[in-house]
Amino acid sequence: MKFIIKLFPEITIKSQSVRLRFIKILTGNIRNVLKHYDETLAVVRHWDNIEVRAKDENQRLAIRDALTRIPGIHHILEVEDVPFTDMHDIFEKALVQYRDQLEGKTFCVRVKRRGKHDFSSIDVERYVGGGLNQHIESARVKLTNPEVTVHLEVEDDRLLLIKGRYEGIGGFPIGTQEDVLSLISGGFDSGVSSYMLMRRGCRVHYCFFNLGGAAHEIGVRQVAHYLWNRFGSSHRVRFVAINFEPVVGEILEKIDDGQMGVILKRMMVRAASKVAERYGVQALVTGEALGQVSSQTLTNLRLIDNVSDTLILRPLISYDKEHIINLARQIGTEDFARTMPEYCGVISKSPTVKAVKSKIEAEEEKFDFSILDKVVEEANNVDIREIALQTEQEVVEVETVNGFGPNDVILDIRSIDEQEDKPLKVEGIDVVSLPFYKLSTKFGDLDQNRTWLLWCERGVMSRLQALYLREQGFNNVKVYRP
């Protein structure tokens, strides 16, 4: 099988040296992502496209899906590459390929040509289109808005019969821009802002301020791992978790109520800037949107920025909440965000929307900054690829099984879409569906006299959720890995 990768248009307008660098990086990213599917896979770069050739037909859908999620790719063409002799040969091959698709439909033919030939692209379009129209009685030519467009590409003595076109996510290849550190909370905003910077070519590391205990961190790990695995797995990234509960405690004890929100954000920026400096990261990324909450007015954002020289990027600054939620739905983080607790907004009962710098600084003089230094020093830094392994170590008390007993029930915790695409059926045992994002509120409604075997495709989510349920006091859970 063969795929032709078309570049994001902004790449094609770069200077020759920059364009070549971007294509080289994108080629490497594709190899890094796809090597897990087919070790014999070949990735070949050209001036205006990249070829991907693989032998394992069983991996066709997986490879195609992975390609659509790699930043820098505008669209993918799934093609059949065959030799040809003349225009009539092109027509005959097109007839075999497209006859069934054109029955009873309107169509047109579009041709792209590279190389030296005694015919033009328009000549091929007319010849092939006329031939298809004559040989398929129920088909009809329609040059504007046809039901089917027959795409052909002619390159030297090769004909590419395009079997399907699949849109990518666009953007720049990861690694073409410098690294950033995303302040991730697991909510709608931080997930979308992280995705937007990945799409713009940055390797995104994650910094999480834990305000809610182990269960909160587990949830945010899920989001970060999901984003990395889905859009950024071509590169290794860090997940840095900082226990911010001592900082919040100090703020609650010593800081005036109205100033708490801004000061908490200033502490987060100070801490994240230290982490960024430690790892040579150039900028911070937040999901803040203008006016969304009290700390996100222009006055307050300016005061928050003043505590650090590190550049702070806010890709969602002009977005409304509905737009952000729609983007979260598109990239798959909506379900995570809907069940993620939000702690920042509850520590201040009457937050200021226009903080005064002198008052903020006066309040911060009451704060013991050794606490901030200590939590940053003790920050837990892991390679995001190790999250699954680390979860295995944390859930030592949760048994992983590959079989089942008479009192067991498999609990499929995948999202509804995944369950509909690939329903789970296991002979000899009941399978119950309960998406991961409903476990916190619905698991208690299940029959607690049964033993529930949590299952998901890769096993990462099931382990994380098993730990979460154990934290909540449910001891009748195991992880099912057949």
From Swiss-Prot:
Active-site residues, record numbering mapped to chain: 456 (cysteine persulfide intermediate)
Enzyme kind, highest EC tier: transferase
Disulphide-bridged cysteine pairs: 344-456
Domain of life: Bacteria
The reaction(s) this protein catalyses: [ThiI sulfur-carrier protein]-S-sulfanyl-L-cysteine + a uridine in tRNA + 2 reduced [2Fe-2S]-[ferredoxin] + ATP + H(+) = [ThiI sulfur-carrier protein]-L-cysteine + a 4-thiouridine in tRNA + 2 oxidized [2Fe-2S]-[ferredoxin] + AMP + diphosphate; [ThiS sulfur-carrier protein]-C-terminal Gly-Gly-AMP + S-sulfanyl-L-cysteinyl-[cysteine desulfurase] + AH2 = [ThiS sulfur-carrier protein]-C-terminal-Gly-aminoethanethioate + L-cysteinyl-[cysteine desulfurase] + A + AMP + 2 H(+)
Keywords attached to this entry: ATP-binding, Cytoplasm, Disulfide bond, Nucleotide-binding, Redox-active center, RNA-binding, Thiamine biosynthesis, Transferase, tRNA-binding
Keyword Nucleus on entry: no
MF terms (GO), sorted A to Z: ATP binding; CCA tRNA nucleotidyltransferase activity; tRNA binding; tRNA-uracil-4 sulfurtransferase activity
GO biological process: thiamine biosynthetic process; thiamine diphosphate biosynthetic process; thiazole biosynthetic process; tRNA 4-thiouridine biosynthesis
Pathway involvement of the protein, from the record: Cofactor biosynthesis; thiamine diphosphate biosynthesis
Keyword Transmembrane recorded: no
GO cellular component: cytosol
Residue ranges of every copy of the Rhodanese domain listed in the record: 404-482
EC number from the UniProt entry: 2.8.1.4
Subcellular location as annotated: Cytoplasm
Binding site for ATP: 183-184, 265, 287, 296
THUMP domain span: 61-165
InterPro entries attached to this UniProt entry: Rhodanese-like_dom, Rhodanese-like_dom_sf, Rossmann-like_a/b/a_fold, ThiI_AANH, ThiI_fer, ThiI_N, THII_Thiazole_biosynth_dom, THUMP_dom
UniProt-listed Pfam families: ThiI (PF02568), ThiI_fer (PF22025), THUMP (PF02926)
Job description of the protein: Catalyzes the ATP-dependent transfer of a sulfur to tRNA to produce 4-thiouridine in position 8 of tRNAs, which functions as a near-UV photosensor. Also catalyzes the transfer of sulfur to the sulfur carrier protein ThiS, forming ThiS-thiocarboxylate. This is a step in the synthesis of thiazole, in the thiamine biosynthesis pathway. The sulfur is donated as persulfide by IscS.
Entry's family note: Belongs to the ThiI family.
PANTHER family in the cross-refs: TRNA SULFURTRANSFERASE
Cross-referenced NCBIfam families: ThiI_C_thiazole, tRNA uracil 4-sulfurtransferase ThiI
Protein name, per record: tRNA sulfurtransferase
Lineage: Bacteria, Pseudomonadati, Pseudomonadota, Gammaproteobacteria, Enterobacterales
